[in-house]
Structure formats: C-alpha cells, structure tokens
Amino acid sequence: MLAYNRAVVIELRTRLTKLFASLGLSRSASQLHVYTFSSFAKRVCGDTALSECEMNEWEGVLLDTIKKKPNDVRAAMPDLQYVFIDEFQDITQTRLDAMFGLKKIYNGLTFFTIGDKNQSIYGFEKKESMDPNYYYKQLYETLHPQKMEMYINYRSYPKIPEEANRYLPEDSRPPVICKNDKKNEPKSEYVYIYQDNRDWSKDFGGYVLWLKEQGVTDLAVFFRTNNEVYHGYSLIKALNLPGIRIRIQGASTCELYRMREIFAVLTLLDTECNKKIKLENNQTEYELKEKIAYWMSQRPNWDSFYMDFAFVLILDYLDFALTDEESHTYGDMADSIRKTLKEDNPQLYKLYDDERFQNRRILLDQQLNVVLTTMHKVKGLEFDAVIITPSVTSLPFNPTEDIDESIPLSPKDIEQIEEERRLLYVAYTRAKKYLFVYKGNRERAVENMQRFTSLEDQWGIRERKVGLDNYNIGFNARFKFHGNKAIAYNVRKNDPVIIKRYIGMDKIGRPFTTYNIIHNGSIVGQLSRSSSIDHRMRTNNIELLTGFFVSDVFYWSYQDTLDADKRKEKEFLKNPAKFNFKKPEPFATKWCEDARKQGYVFIVDIAGYGK
C-alpha cells in the first residue's frame, strides 16, 4: 500500500490491523506492507543506493532501479502481488512510471487506486501537467482498470456541497448527501455567500458569539496565501475577542520537527534515548505529560498548542507501542515522531482532535478554537464552521511575477485556474455545519476563467517566496549568537517585528548594508540577499518597515549547515557554471565556537505586509 505521507501510512496500518483482527485474520495483516513513496524507495533500493541522495531524489532512483535492475527489485520484494495507491489524483509522472515499471516485472501484479479528481490541488508541484486527467488517462490506457465510483458525502449539511459543486467541471457527477445529514439539516440558514466585496473582519466578532451559542467548538478561517493569513491575524487580533484560542497553520518554511516547541520535546526524548517506555499504569505517559505541562507554565512565550501537539504525537506512539510485541525506547519514539514531522502534512492535525486523545491532552479548557490557515493546508480536515476570505493575490498564481490581464490565457494558465476552482471546492467542503463565503474580484475571476492582477502591494511589501533562504543563518550563528537564549525564551509566535536598515563598514573600510529583524528593540535575525523584502528595501531606499509578525521560531543545527555545504560542493562539481565557476564558500566556517559547541541556533521566521 502506497500513501503520500507517513501520518496516513500510520493511520492506514492501524485501521487495517484492527479490521483484520475483527475478522479473525490477524496473521494475514502481517502480509500488508504500507509505505510512503520514499520509504518504498528505501525498501527497494536499499540504504547504500540512496546514501548520496536527497530524499526528494529517492523516487527518481526508485524509477531508475525498476527500469534497469529488475532482479534487485524482485530480491527486495519477491512475493509482490497487489499494489494499492491512495490519493491517486496527486500522483506524479515519476511515481506513475515506477508503478507501470513494476507491472512489467511482476506479470500477475494487480493494482487498486482510489482518488478524487476534484480534490487534485497540488498540481503546482508537478512538472508535466496540473490536470489530473493527464495521469488518469495514462492509467486507463495502460492498465485498463475496472472503474467503481463512490458519491455519498457524509461530512456536510446538504447546501454546503451544493454551493461547492459550482466549481466542478460540467461532466463531474456531484456527491450525494447521506440520509442522516438530510434528516438533521437545520431549518435555519447555515450557508452565507457574500458577493459584494464585504469586509469579513467586521462580521467576525458577531460570528464568534453566535457560533458559541450554537455549540460550535472549532471555526476555521481560510486564506489563499501565508501572508494573507497573517494579515487576517492582525485584523482578528485588533478585535481583542475573549474566549477564543487562535491557532495559525500557515505555509511551512521548514519541517515541523524544527519548531522550537517540538524541538524541545524531541530533545527531551533524545537525552534519555535508551530509557525503556513503560506502558504499565501509563507511567511514561504521565511522566512526560507532567514535564511538558510544567514547561507550559514556565515558558509563557512558547506556543502551548504546539507543545500539546507534540504530546499528542507521543500519545499516538504509545498507543502503537501498546499493540506491538517489541519493547520500545524514548529514542525509538523520538525517531518515529521526527520522521512523521519531516513531511508538510495537514492531516497530522487530525490527530490532535482524535477522540482517543481529547481527554488525555494537556489543554482541556473549553474555548472556541479559531484556526487560521491556507487552503492547501486543509485537505483531509473538517471543521464545524468555515469562513472563506477573499484573496488579493494574482491569478494564475505567481508570487514572483506580476500578471498582465490583457494577455490571453495559455493552456497552462487554464490548467492553473482550473486547479484554483478545485481548491475552492476543497475549501467549501471542509465545512460540516456552517459556511460563510466572502467573494471579491479574484474569486469572480476564478469563476469566469480570467486573469487577475495581484493587489497585495496595496497592503505592503511582502516576502514573495517562503523559505529558509530568506534569512542569514550565519548571522545568528556568529555575530548574534549571544542573543540566541533570548530568542529561545523571549520571542513569542505572532509577536510584531520590524525590519530596519543597518549601514556599517567592513575590515578594509568599505560600507555595507544589511536589513535586521528587530523584536522589542533587540536584533533577532537578518534578511539574506535572497529575500524579496531585502531587495525592495534596497531598491526603494527604505530604512524601516513595520507590519510583520513572528510566524515561527525554529532551530537550525551545525550538522544541517555541514550537510548543506556538502550538497553545494556536489552541485558545484556537477555544474560549475551555475556558480560562475567559483567554488562556493562553506557556511560552516562562519559559525562561532560557542554556536558549534551548542550544535544549533534559533531562527526567527516572519510573515506579513510591511509599510
């Protein structure tokens, strides 16, 4: 069985083990092997073949092995009979070619795929085509599968999918509402569509009060981009509403295990890596719960949700260990959680709300959870109530270039806008009970298959691309390492920061300019020359920008820098022209001795619109 991330793999394995046990087929369950595509590559190719490759290159090595070394594949998996592919609509060409290659090696191999074309929203990651039909057509023509269809929607009250269906292609068969949802449908209105550029933030406080009265426990507010999430956060924060807990799930700059709060929990497990997990009387659970709860009380600037989220991941591992005959250590648990968090997977948040953990978590107070998130982060999730805000970003979406509305749409542009329609379909269908949609000019452009020029510059200067490259990590690891402890304990997620120009002199008297990130009067980081904010400030001779927020505090290790230096050296040897035939200078040499001894530094990640 092949799934797209480790969290789904774990969920599938757990569900199938329980299913087979209930059918009296526990032994048969041992013949099921559930993998991500990368772990499947590791099983087939082996550690040695992948040791010199980045994880994002593993699938290419897998395809190459299947094509050129079929005997090695058979040796790794001699009895392969069935392949199940989950979420087929998100397949890539490399993965599809690998599956077709397996069919040539194993003559009697049977495939089973499951997916929903209308939920294909990650086409921007694919090189060949964003259109899911491009891949389904190859599947149909190569394997001639029998097609079976499921249409019943078990999540939402009837009017919610009815509104969402407007974004489906004409030849799509819309889902059928299950009888219970029809039976329980409220008589009062529960879907509100505003077509008139109405300001959602002015309605927000009233919605919170009303939804609380309806017994709603979670409200999600959807945005198209990460910067729009933080713009929305600034509007909600200004309302100063009591009795709500705000959680931000924006676009990830790096893997979740790098977040300060989760890093601390994993480090706690690593320091006692050989300690045996004690399941009797929930001893390990209570010990770790007490420790993490103590941190919550003593570290007010840390994100309590993510500490609790890390604890829920511990609970999930302990439940797994309870069903496994092998003994487990704290180190095993840390490694497993770290692997799970390597993938940018929104479905991980489902674990937090899993009924198994609702009374075992640390945070149990009954506040309304308000989740601010990008639309790409909600696939597989569901919420009692959803607010969809209007976007001002470009269409087709291109964060690095401006859109000219006068140019006719190319076939690729059409594919991109069709994916935006699917994205709105997915967003609408996350709502179970209440849906509030605010439409602006961009949403009308999506509906009418038209271009739309970004209006984000009206809000301020933004980072056009999320990523670690926007920050000078060496600055925190050398010149500002003495401030690392302050970042660790004093910088709170969502705190305001400013960007300020600094003009200095180098050792031989030449002037230089940098742009520093300042939190409560102290420098906590520096933008790199890759940052689009840095570029705009230089170009427009801007000294100071306000309007930014701390989106995350994450760690970066000395080993990470050594590994990055090795990758760059390898890249240089392959393609020196990319570096103007000048060997790149290693960044590890720029770490000060104290930073090397500690082994890591904290980096402040920012988002928002600067003015």
Q: Where do the model's predicted regions map?
A:
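Conserved nucleotide-binding/hydrolysis micro-motifs of P-loop NTPases
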Residues: 6-9, 39-41, 117-121, 127-129, ...
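Conserved RecA-like helicase ATPase core segment
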Residues: 97-183
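Accessory/regulatory regions of helicases
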Residues: 399-401, 406-480
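Conserved helicase NTPase motor core
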Residues: 33-130, 152, 379-380, 385
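Conserved active-site motif detector
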Residues: 444-611
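Core RecA-like ATPase module of SF1/SF2 helicases and allied nucleic-acid translocases
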Residues: 6, 216-418, 434
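P-loop NTPase Walker
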Residues: 1-48, 429
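Helicase P-loop NTPase motor core
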Residues: 144-146, 152-244, 359
